[in-house]
Amino acid sequence: MAIDIHVYDTYVKAKDSHTMHFDVITDVQDHDKAIEFAKQWLATIGEDGAKVTGEECQFCHTQGAPEPVENEIKEKGFFIQKMEGCP
């Protein structure tokens, strides 16, 4: 049975000033954790220090998790769904 996941719609300005749009997906509805997960992921793509607050990262909705998303959440605690402007 799929777990419920919580989707945080996130828009962050990159170092070169373009906007990256991605969703932070987690199994816990915790805004502060979603922001922390966004910062962790941004650091892995060389965008550490990017501004991520409640303004850039907002709760969007809750839904059932597809298996690959559920597996990554179990492994890392979160999943990043790249939307626009992400490497």
Where are these regions (language model features)?
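Acidic, low-complexity intrinsically disordered segments
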Residues: 37-87
